[in-house]
């Protein structure tokens, strides 16, 4: 403790340097003056005689121990093992407690006992300590926390040993200062001055203040640092530290962050300060607020390994674990800190330690691709065969993570290569080990298996001398010569050269790279002093280096001591051994000798992660070899039990088969694939819905498909298998093989056989990135879990981690690619286009094809798209089901260690990748495969593979995915994505990749929308996992749809959505987090650009078509191409008439083409094509009229949209699509007809009407578009509500009116928004919308045009009454299904108007944006694509009759996974209208949604998120969303920020994903659901309300927010996923989606309180464009998945618009009346909303805010009228108002609220 001695000396009177320890105590007396008896402080620096480990015991006390001590000591010692009763006084609480404390335990343990026994909380409790009062002439002192209690002899003056528990203040020898003087000294100004002196190294001034009696134990109010911790982070602060210590600073005083000075020095890699502190008697084992030691922080932070060596040399304790069971060794491997790892192993770290997920350090290396660390572990004897709790070995984890080179290393490692440590670690001798054989002995014995030499270093009596290691190496060398004298010498020398001299410079070795050139645990204090004073004596070797690592000299070195060799830059160095003080021994060109470790860096022979295309390339290179055969390389065939069975699956039309298929993607059979017992086929069941069709037939997760309908599919690619399944229709005969490992009994069969999920690997990669992002996002949340440290550490290691993250990102993209199985390939796109009659996507193939971009963008895009579509990427969906059990939440099997949430993640991930992914399916599957891991990872940032630890690194793809799901409502991220799609097709593909780059004004907004979309996608994934194979089988469609959905949101959407996932745990509470981090990440994620590209591609490709018009109606080629990109956004936007249109408009004009070219096109192309039939519409038909109106409206908006005019005509057409849809549903149409009927156009402002007329013509022009544009697109202008657009694809165009009605009804909720419409301007739009729905009907014919693509999303808005569909001819139904407008089940039909299937036609709805803008914002109708997706679910069409409305086929198809899945059954039930994304649960919905939500929650994965997320997500998410959305709207196009945490509560991630967006609904579900149902009904009644929203249209351009709600709804709808989402969160999920409504006024938590319609109304209103819109959207949003849709809708760039009308829908849905707006519909709109003041004459849904005010007057509550009107509360909002909403509206009196609620019930009843 030379230092301590020095410190003492410095302290004031260098009492005797030779005995620094003694002096330390002495100094106290020495400075009788004002100098406080710092020594008495309780821990003399060295305490030569002190028994304490740190020799910290004050001299006096120890002497006591020796003298009087023996007796007392014995007293305390006697009890030794047994506890001793100690009386503890707590002066601050004026309490005294008698506690039994264990004398053999550290004081820290006794302190925790005391803290636990307190019944009052103490501020800054960590800085309270046990104080031994002065007695017998000895000064009182605080007991050092890391010394044993028995080392402090008890006071014999009292019957019971007495200690005080008090705040650590400076201990003064006597009262030298009176209170006044003391107070004067400790003013804020003085304390600040003191901190400044410390910062400036003003040692003299610091000493002067301390001499006056200043207490240095305080926190800086700004930074939270204390003087000692600040000094510990400074260079050359040795003297300063000594002065502070001697001035009474406590070595274990903690900063506000809970860190001691030792932690701070270690984190700063300040070896000199660390050495000084240790020499002053600090313990290396101080715990921070999380119970973690400096050594843990060192392993976590990386960098120069000298601090790690110093701590270990000073007997630092190994094996400290965080909340997730991660030890130092795990963290070192997680971040690739090789040198730290070697030091840890050398000092005895346990290589077999498992974290909460059962992952060992080798598993972590495999997961994070840390090859150098893995080599070190293997070389030192790590066991490769240890299985984590997911029953995976490190090799399997590496395969799952896609780290094939590392997997090869692990697999080929031979036991003969193991070289255990033959050297014995050296320890500092100065520390008194507790007990004769205290720590030293046990520690060496703890040596790891790699250490053959177990002889612990004899622990010499504690010697005051500094440890060898602590000295500079030069000194060390000399000391080596004479060990005995060395102690004394060392003291002096250390004082002299001590920390100052020595290889200060060298000791700070640069952070060791992967190769870990990090310094060896060299002890020398590393003062800045010259490297080596005199000759650096001989170097001392610690241990041999691991062979096989290659190093290059990065800087020259000239020898300065004996044995050193010169190095020149660029020379290859072979490292032979690691020495002390950061010196290594190596050979260079025949010269062998020592050199500083920081002069060399390890080089990786192959940089796998550097190339962005890695995943794809690597896969090509490696995956096939690992396909089937290699997975079981670890076990012999005899290890597997093969069980084959033939299952006959018979499903109903509207449902799926209930399984998710995963596997390799390939255009042609993969002949190279060799089936093995472990991996008998390329395609396998990733998940099977419990009690679903497949489940009942005996199929289980992990079963490999051998034959499908008699065709052998062992080597067949995913798409082909899906096609085979589809061909069979409702009957499927499959021959499957279950592979089970004999030894394993729990989920073994699934585990061993399941191919490693590629997604995991992707997730892994993503995980790194996702994790970091997510962790950071989650940090706040995780903090509670104690993950904060991991996060902080991650942050600290950020610089070093960054590369990993980047890699992860790029990998993530790759990974995402894997999920691309979902993603649409160029071929798929072409086929889709052909199917749709669209010209092939010119750019689509190219962009899709681009291997790299595609993989990157595709992966994410896929995810997004799938989410948006409601068909989650296969991977997600598959994973979800599997994960459900063991994925997101720790899988049950994995769950073993799910103690902390982080654990959950931790464990979750392993399961995720537990099954090896089939090689063939490699990339596609990838996306889902890793999800669990990802999640797990997320969960535990620092934990195991999938553990939170990973969080630091990029989040694994799965986690991200999960997050995205949760955040389904990504809000901002998508802006870029929107942009990308916007450009023309040709441009788009490339642009897509650059989605960010394409941020033209309009694009940008779209991009935002895109983000939304992405978010939506994320939820969709969860849902997907629920959906059966059929849905999944619509992979192409799904992909397309995803692309579509993603298209706008797409590019970054999926990825982003996922990314939030990383935050999975953390972000999920806010949901926002997601948005920002991941879900929303869409826009911001690294993959964003790729995503954009992907989206673009997808959009271009059938995907976007599939989303909107893909199958139902193929828009014109240009439309598809361009529109696709914009189509999604537009669709989404379109959904919300106002918001949607605005979004659309701002978004790619092309998508909105109608807008841009609408005017010209509209007029020129007066012929609209019927979306379903593809035949030209009669211009006079309602559909044509509606289309025309929409077109007109679009045209009027065109200018604003024009920026993205690509495919203007197409855009125009989309409007008609919607109309068409409406036309389809005659019943509904009729209901809405009065208000929205084609004749309604009259109602529409003239311009709008004209536009509507134009639209029809235009639609005719582009028959392809019309094909799927059944959406009943209410003219935008016509139907502001159109946004609501229930794209009902009624079976025939003849139901348009009714559809319109339905649409209107849905808007009913949004109608509130129309309320503003009621104002003069608004009124116009309102009526327009109404007219538009009828018009929409005609549009049906016309929508086929490009509109279809755009409209698809709009479609989502459409509510088809299921009954209606059933009533309509089956053919229509099929078409609708194709379009994605599957009619909702009859229950929904009753008035819900969930024209889910209609999603495709969604576009027209947006048309109603603003009274001013008569042009409908033609949103691409998602339905068509969805319909296409539906292909497999043609039955969906009939779903109208089916209550479940599996018909969500649009969505279901899109998110085939979720819809088909059993879950979807429920879901569909809940929200019939996926298409429109509002899954209104109408009457049924309320209940179903809950169950749905619950289901997901119930599932393991969901659960973990659910609890928190669910609740918070519902409220928070919605709220956040709302805020973001509102803000976004406010910002106009720009913000995509609304985070649509539109989680679909689907089985797949259901809960978690939904948790965010949906959580609200779920949590609020009871309310929300009921509200939703009533709202839905209201919606039905008031579809036009929604229509009114379009009024916002004009404003919406300006105020996308207004539009966005509808657009959102539309989007959702278009995203098949939306439906799925809505299905998943049947409760309010869809609504929740709508929830997103990104109203400009995010101010309302409305989002989260879906019920709070206040804001929503405004949203829907023209005013919606303002903040008002957001609120309305929220409530509606809650109801259905529309949010999802809407988010995709808003994808492109108008996040604000993203606030979709969805919320409107919600509100509407709230209205109980099932009739679709019959009365309102009949009137031209709710009449002019404004004019029709007499609220008695209108249905509640149609009330304007003024009607609401009149109604309040009528119930004698006029005093609240102003607030209600200010908040734009319209009739549709009223039923959704919650208690909080009322309070916000000024209704604070319970009586008033009850009166309002009672009056509302009477209204509902009337």
From Swiss-Prot:
Domain of life the protein comes from: Eukaryota
Gene (UniProt): SHANK3
Known outcome of mutating residue 1045 to S: Found in a patient with neuropsychiatric disorders; uncertain significance
Organism: Homo sapiens
Keywords, ordered alphabetically: Actin-binding, ANK repeat, Autism spectrum disorder, Cell projection, Chromosomal rearrangement, Coiled coil, Cytoplasm, Disease variant, Methylation, Phosphoprotein, Repeat, Schizophrenia, SH3 domain, SH3-binding, Synapse
Mutagenesis / variant outcome for changing residue 1338 to L: Found in a patient with neuropsychiatric disorders; uncertain significance
Reported tissue expression: Expressed in the cerebral cortex and the cerebellum.
GO aspect biological process, one term: synapse assembly
Described function: Major scaffold postsynaptic density protein which interacts with multiple proteins and complexes to orchestrate the dendritic spine and synapse formation, maturation and maintenance. Interconnects receptors of the postsynaptic membrane including NMDA-type and metabotropic glutamate receptors via complexes with GKAP/PSD-95 and HOMER, respectively, and the actin-based cytoskeleton. Plays a role in the structural and functional organization of the dendritic spine and synaptic junction through the interaction with Arp2/3 and WAVE1 complex as well as the promotion of the F-actin clusters.
Protein name as it appears in the record: SH3 and multiple ankyrin repeat domains protein 3
Residues annotated as domain PDZ: 646-740
Ranges where the SH3 domain occurs: 546-605
GO MF annotation list: actin binding; ionotropic glutamate receptor binding; scaffold protein binding; SH3 domain binding; synaptic receptor adaptor activity; zinc ion binding
Any coiled-coil regions, as ranges: 1569-1589
GO cellular component: ciliary membrane; cytosol; dendritic spine; neuron projection; neuron spine; plasma membrane; postsynaptic density
Stretch list, region Intramolecular interaction with the ANK repeats: 76-150
Compositional bias of kind Basic and acidic residues: 407-416, 1173-1193, 1360-1370
CDD domains, per database record: FERM_F0_SHANK3, PDZ_SHANK1_3-like, SAM_Shank1_2_3, SH3_Shank3
Modified sites of kind Phosphothreonine: 988, 1204, 1309
Effect noted on mutating residue 375 to C: Found in patients with neuropsychiatric disorders; uncertain significance; disrupts synaptic localization
Gly residues bias (residue ranges): 993-1013
Subcellular location, principal: cytoplasm
Chain positions of ANK repeats: 223-253, 257-286, 290-320, 324-353, 357-386, 390-420
Subcellular location per the Swiss-Prot or TrEMBL entry: Cytoplasm; Postsynaptic density; Cell projection, Dendritic spine
Compositional bias ranges of the Polar residues kind: 1495-1505
Statement: the UniProt record of this protein carries the keyword Phosphoprotein: yes
Domain SAM: 1743-1806
Result, substituting residue 416 to L: Found in patient with neuropsychiatric disorders; uncertain significance
């Amino acid at each position: 403790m030379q230092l301590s001695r020095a410190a003492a000396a410095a302290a004031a009177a260098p009492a005797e340097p030779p005995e620094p320890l003694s002096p330390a105590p002495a100094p106290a007396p020495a400075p009788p003056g004002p100098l406080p008896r710092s020594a008495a402080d309780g821990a003399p620096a060295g305490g030569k005689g002190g028994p304490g480990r740190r020799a910290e015991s004050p001299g006096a006390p120890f002497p006591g121990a020796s003298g009087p001590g023996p007796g007392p000591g014995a007293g305390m010692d006697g009890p030794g093992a047994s506890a001793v009763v100690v009386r503890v006084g707590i002066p601050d609480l004026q309490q005294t407690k008698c506690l039994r404390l264990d004398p053999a335990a550290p004081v820290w343990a006794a302190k925790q006992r005391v803290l636990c026994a307190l019944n009052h909380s103490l501020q800054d409790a960590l800085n309270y300590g046990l104080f031994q009062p002065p007695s017998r002439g000895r000064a009182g002192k605080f007991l050092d926390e890391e010394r044993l209690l028995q080392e402090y002899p008890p006071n014999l003056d009292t019957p019971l040993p007495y200690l005080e528990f008090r705040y650590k203040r400076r201990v003064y020898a006597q009262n030298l200062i009176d209170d006044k003087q003391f107070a004067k000294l400790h003013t804020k100004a003085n304390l600040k001055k003191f901190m400044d002196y410390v910062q400036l190294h003003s040692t003299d001034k610091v000493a002067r203040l301390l001499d006056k009696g200043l207490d240095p134990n305080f926190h800086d109010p700004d930074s939270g640092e204390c003087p000692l911790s600040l000094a510990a982070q400074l260079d050359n602060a040795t003297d300063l530290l000594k002065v502070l210590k001697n001035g009474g600073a406590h070595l274990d005083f903690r900063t506000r962050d809970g860190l001691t000075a030792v932690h701070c020095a270690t984190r700063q890699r300040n070896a000199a300060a660390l050495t000084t502190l240790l020499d002053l008697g600090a313990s290396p084992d101080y715990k921070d607020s999380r119970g973690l030691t400096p050594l843990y922080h060192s392993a976590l932070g990386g960098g120069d390994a000298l601090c790690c060596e110093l701590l270990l040399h000073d007997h630092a304790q190994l094996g400290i674990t965080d909340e997730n069971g991660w030890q130092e060794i795990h963290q070192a491997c997680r971040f690739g800190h090789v040198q730290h790892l070697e030091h840890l192993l050398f000092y005895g770290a346990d290589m077999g330690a498992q974290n909460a997920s059962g992952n060992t350090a080798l598993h972590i290396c495999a997961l994070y691709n840390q090859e150098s660390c893995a080599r070190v572990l293997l070389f030192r004897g790590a066991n490769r065969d240890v299985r984590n709790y997911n029953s995976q070995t490190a090799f399997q984890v590496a395969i799952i993570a896609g780290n094939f080179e590392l997997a090869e290393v692990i697999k080929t490692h031979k036991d003969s290569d193991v070289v255990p440590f033959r050297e014995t670690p050296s320890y500092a001798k100065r520390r008194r080990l507790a007990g004769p054989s205290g720590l030293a002995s046990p520690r060496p014995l703890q040596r790891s298996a790699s250490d053959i030499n177990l002889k612990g270093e004899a622990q010499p009596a504690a010697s005051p001398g500094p440890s060898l290691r602590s000295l500079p190496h030069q000194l060390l060398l000399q000391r080596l010569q004479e060990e005995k004298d060395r102690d004394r010498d060392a003291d002096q020398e250390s004082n002299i050269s001590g920390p100052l001299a020595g290889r200060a410079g060298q000791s700070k070795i640069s952070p060791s790279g992967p190769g870990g050139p990090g310094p060896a645990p060299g002890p020398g204090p590393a003062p800045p002093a010259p490297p080596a004073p005199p000759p650096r004596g001989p170097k001392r070797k610690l241990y041999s280096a691991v062979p096989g690592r290659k190093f290059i000299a990065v800087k020259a070195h000239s020898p300065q001591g004996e044995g050193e060799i010169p190095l020149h830059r660029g020379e290859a160095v072979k490292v032979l051994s690691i020495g002390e003080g950061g010196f290594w021994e190596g050979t260079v060109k025949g010269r062998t000798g020592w050199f500083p470790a920081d002069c060399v860096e390890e080089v990786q022979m192959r940089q796998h992660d550097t190339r962005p295309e890695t995943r794809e390339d690597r896969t090509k290179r490696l995956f096939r070899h690992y396909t089937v055969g290699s997975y079981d390389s670890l076990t012999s065939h005899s290890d597997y039990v093969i069980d084959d069975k033939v299952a006959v699956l018979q499903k109903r039309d509207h449902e799926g088969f209930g399984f998710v298929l995963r596997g390799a993607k390939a255009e042609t059979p993969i002949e190279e694939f060799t089936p093995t017992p472990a991996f008998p086929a390329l395609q396998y069941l990733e998940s099977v819905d419990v009690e679903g069709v497949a489940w009942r037939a005996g199929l289980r997760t992990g079963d490999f498909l051998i034959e499908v309908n008699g065709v052998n599919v062992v080597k067949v690619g995913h798409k082909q298998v899906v096609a085979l399944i589809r061909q069979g229709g409702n009957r499927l005969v499959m021959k499957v093989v279950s592979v089970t490992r004999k030894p394993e009994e729990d989920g073994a069969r699934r585990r061993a056989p399941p191919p490693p999920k590629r997604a995991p690997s992707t997730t892994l990669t993503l995980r790194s990135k996702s994790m970091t992002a997510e962790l950071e996002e989650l940090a706040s949340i995780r903090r509670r879990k104690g993950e904060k440290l991991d996060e902080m550490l991650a942050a600290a290691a950020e610089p070093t981690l960054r590369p990993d993250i980047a890699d992860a990102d790029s990998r993530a993209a790759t990974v995402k690619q894997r999920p691309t199985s979902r993603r649409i390939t160029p071929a798929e796109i072409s086929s889709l286009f052909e199917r749709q009659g669209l010209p092939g996507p010119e750019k689509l193939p190219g962009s899709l094809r681009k291997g790299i971009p595609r993989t990157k963008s595709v992966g994410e895009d896929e995810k997004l798209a799938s989410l948006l579509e409601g068909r989650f990427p296969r991977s997600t969906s598959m994973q979800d089901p599997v994960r459900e059990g063991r994925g997101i939440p720790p899988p049950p099997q994995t769950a073993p260690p799910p103690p902390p949430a982080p654990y959950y993640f931790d464990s979750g991930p392993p399961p995720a990748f537990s099954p090896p992914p089939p090689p063939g399916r490699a990339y596609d599957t990838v996306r889902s495969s890793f999800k669990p891991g990802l999640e797990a990872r997320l969960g535990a940032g620092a934990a195991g593979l999938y553990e939170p630890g990973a969080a630091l690194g990029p989040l694994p793809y799965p986690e991200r995915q999960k997050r995205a799901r949760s955040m389904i409502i990504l809000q901002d991220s998508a802006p870029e994505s929107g942009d990308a799609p916007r450009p023309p097709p040709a441009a788009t593909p490339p642009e897509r990749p650059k989605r960010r780059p394409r941020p033209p004004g309009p694009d940008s907004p779209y991009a935002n929308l895109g983000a939304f979309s992405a978010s939506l996608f994320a939820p969709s994934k969860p849902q997907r996992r629920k959906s059966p194979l059929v849905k999944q089988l619509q992979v192409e469609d799904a992909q397309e749809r995803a692309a579509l959905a993603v298209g706008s949101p797409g590019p970054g959407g999926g990825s982003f959505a996922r990314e939030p996932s990383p935050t999975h745990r953390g972000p999920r509470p806010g949901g926002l987090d997601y948005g920002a981090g991941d879900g929303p990440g869409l826009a911001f994620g690294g993959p964003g650009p790729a995503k954009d590209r992907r989206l673009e591609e997808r959009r271009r490709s059938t995907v976007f078509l599939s989303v909107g018009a893909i199958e139902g109606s193929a828009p014109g080629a240009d439309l598809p191409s361009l529109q696709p990109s914009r189509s999604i956004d537009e669709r989404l936007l379109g959904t919300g008439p106002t918001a949607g249109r605005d979004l659309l408009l701002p978004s790619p004009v092309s998508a909105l083409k109608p807008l841009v070219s609408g005017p010209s096109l509209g007029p020129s192309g007066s012929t609209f094509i019927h979306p379903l039939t593809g035949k030209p519409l009669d211009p006079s038909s309602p559909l044509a009229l509606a289309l025309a109106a929409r077109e007109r409206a679009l045209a009027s908006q065109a200018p604003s949209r024009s920026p993205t005019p690509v495919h203007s005509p197409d855009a125009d057409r989309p409007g008609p699509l919607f109309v068409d849809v409406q036309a389809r549903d005659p019943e509904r149409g009729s209901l809405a007809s009065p208000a929205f009927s084609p004749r309604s156009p009259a109602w529409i402002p003239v311009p709008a009407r004209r536009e509507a007329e134009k639209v029809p013509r235009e639609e005719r022009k582009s028959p392809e578009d019309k094909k799927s544009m059944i959406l009943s697109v209410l003219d935008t202008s016509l139907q502001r509500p159109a946004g609501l657009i229930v794209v009902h694809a009624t079976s025939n165009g003849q139901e348009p009116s009714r559809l319109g009605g339905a649409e209107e009804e849905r808007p009913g909720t949004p109608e509130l928004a129309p309320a503003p419409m009621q104002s003069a301007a608004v009124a116009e739009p309102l009526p327009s919308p109404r007219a538009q729905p009828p018009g929409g009907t005609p549009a049906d014919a016309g929508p086929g045009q490009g509109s279809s693509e755009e409209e698809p999303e709009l479609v989502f808005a459409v509510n088809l009454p299921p009954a209606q569909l059933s009533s309509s001819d089956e053919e229509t139904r099929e078409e609708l299904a194709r379009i994605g407008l599957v009619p909702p089940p009859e229950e929904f039909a009753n008035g819900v108007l969930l024209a889910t299937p209609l999603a495709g036609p969604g576009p027209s709805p947006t048309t109603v944006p603003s009274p001013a803008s008569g042009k409908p914002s033609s949103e691409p109708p998602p339905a068509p694509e969805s319909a296409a997706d539906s292909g497999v679910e043609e039955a969906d069409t009939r779903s109208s009759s089916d209550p479940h409305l599996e018909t969500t086929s649009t969505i279901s198809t899109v998110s085939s996974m979720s819809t088909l899945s059993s879950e979807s059954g429920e879901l569909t039930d809940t929200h019939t209208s996926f298409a429109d994304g509002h899954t209104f649960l109408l009457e049924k919905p309320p209940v179903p949604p809950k169950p749905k939500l619950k289901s997901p929650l119930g599932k393991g994965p969901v659960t973990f998120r659910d609890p928190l997320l669910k609740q918070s997500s519902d409220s928070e998410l919605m709220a956040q969303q709302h805020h973001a959305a509102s803000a976004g709207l406010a910002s106009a196009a720009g913000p995509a920020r609304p985070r649509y945490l539109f989680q679909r509560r689907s089985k797949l991630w259901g809960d978690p994903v939904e948790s965010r967006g949906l959580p609200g609904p779920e949590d609020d579900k009871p309310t929300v659901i009921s509200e939703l149902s009533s709202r839905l009904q209201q919606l039905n009644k008031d579809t036009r309300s929604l229509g009114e929203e379009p009024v916002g249209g004009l404003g919406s351009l300006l105020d996308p927010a207004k539009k966005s709600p509808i657009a959102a709804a539309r989007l959702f709808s278009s995203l098949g996923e939306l439906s799925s989402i809505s299905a998943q969160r049947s409760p309010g999920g869809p609504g929740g989606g709508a929830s997103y409504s990104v109203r400009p006024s995010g101010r309302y938590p409305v989002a989260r309180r879906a019920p709070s319609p206040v804001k929503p109304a405004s949203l829907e209103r023209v005013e919606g464009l303002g903040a008002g819109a957001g609120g309305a959207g929220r409530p509606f949003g809650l109801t259905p998945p529309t949010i999802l849709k809407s988010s995709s809708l808003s994808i492109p760039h108008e996040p604000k618009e993203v606030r979709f009308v969805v919320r409107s829908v919600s509100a509407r849905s709230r209205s109980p009346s099932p009739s679709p707006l019959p009365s309102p519909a009949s009137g031209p709109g709710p009449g002019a909303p404004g004019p029709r003041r007499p609220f008695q004459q209108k249905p509640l849904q149609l009330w304007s805010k003024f009607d609401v005010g009149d109604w309040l007057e009528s119930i004698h509550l006029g005093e609240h009228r102003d607030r209600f009107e200010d908040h734009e509360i319209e009739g549709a909002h009223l039923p959704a108002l919650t208690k909080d909403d009322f309070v916000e509206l000024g209704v604070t009196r319970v009586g008033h609220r009850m009166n309002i609620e009672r009056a509302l019930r009477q209204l509902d009843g009337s």
